[in-house]
């Protein structure tokens, strides 16, 4: 199994269990998330409940709907960015990430980051923002949005910010 960590923070953000599609010249990975129900375990042990006992005081089995990727990788939602905040983040992010990339990747990154930024700016009002579990200020952002008519969110990752780790 492959796990993808944030190159800057080491937070696990994705795994190969979630197929991705490269977009924007390979700068972004698009990954489909799914709403899943967590909890509400129904245990049937075949016993007859007592008619006189009333309600059982068993465990709290409240079902909760979560997005699989957010839950599995413990992503933390952040407040939305306006255009100025987003561009400020991208500028700082480029400065932090570029020195961590190999020379050939640096060239591709510098050449194509503007296109990826414009793509994200076009969706800015529809995006949800997430960071890794550590909630580090300098970490990569993970973006989520809903495609037209979709019930499940689509996630966007900066591909160059991910470090592949074999588990």
From Swiss-Prot:
Record-annotated TCTP domain positions: 1-167
A GO CC annotation given for this chain: cytoplasm
One Pfam short name: TCTP
Family: Belongs to the TCTP family.
InterPro entries: Mss4-like_sf, Mss4/transl-control_tumour, TCTP, Translation_control_tumour_CS, Translational_control_tumour_p
The protein's name: Translationally-controlled tumor protein homolog
Induction context: Induced in root tips during the externally-induced root cap cell differentiation.
Predominant location: cytoplasm
Keyword Phosphoprotein: no
Entry keyword set: Calcium, Cytoplasm
Keyword Transmembrane helix carried by entry: no
Gene3D superfamilies, alphabetized: Metal Binding Protein, Guanine Nucleotide Exchange Factor, Chain A
Role noted for this protein: Involved in calcium binding and microtubule stabilization.
